[in-house]
Amino acid sequence: MALLSLLTPRYWPLWTGIGILWGLTHLPYRWQLAAGRQLGHITYQLAWRRRRIADINLKLCFPDLDETQRQQLLRRHFESLGMGLLEMLSAWWLPDARLEHLGHIQGLEHLNAALARGRGVILFGAHFTSLEIGMRFLTMHTAIHAAYRPHENPLIEYFMKKSRDSRAEKAIPRDAVREMLRSLKKNKALWFASDQNFRHKHSVFADFFGRQAATNTAASRLAQISGAAVVPFFTQRLENGYKVILQPALDDFPSGDNRQDALRLNQLIEAQIRKAPEQYLWVHRRFKDRPEGEENVY
């Protein structure tokens, strides 16, 4: 959509909000995190539907927590959401010089070794609140193509697509499988996540924190068709910056068993979540689709 069409009065309130957020992203780093935590507190109070979803998810995934512990984790999660929003916008808008000292990459040699095979790399990730800034740190070292879900709001989609195209080299709608395969054929690193519940004929149910979760098998299928290596990729917020984690390429993947592959990927995500549970995107209805005979948990 042309930018001129996004300047009409219907978008003015959103433009105002974007202007405020632009200002917050240019605060010193510590102030920015503090502002993000406050945004999270406000969101916790106002977004009661998402708060309820996150609370249910935490109850399902961490049954050993008592009510007080779970509510404390829930509040920390919303703080992480607020910080994640400003981190995402910082990743879109700020120059490398403002960010590069904050990112510490662990395992870059695994990505380089996988790219040296010449058949492309699937950077398998998940929806953690520091996802965008983690990808930004990685783009300082290599070109990335990122699969994403287009936003329904045209103005947000404009900024999302424009920013990701400029920082990540190329943003690809998650349903554009042929375009993803072309990227892999060019030996590019393609970021892809399978941890959100979207109805899809290629989803299977696989264990996630002891519960069956509908899991997209696209990573397995892309790897099978292209011969690409699959390198797990996660980002964790620390006290003084961020740790970007690149693990060794998965052996014997895909295995030929989509359900077993989905379980393996879910276990990788679960292990990372347990390191910093507040930093995962709990406001998503991860357990929305249920196996036949099970009731809706939400």
Predicted regions and their residues:
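Membrane-anchoring hydrophobic helices of lipid-metabolizing enzymes
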Residues: A2-G125, F159-K162, S166-A168
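Catalytic core of membrane glycerolipid acyltransferases/transacylases, capturing the structured
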Residues: R117-D175, N197-S203, D207, R211
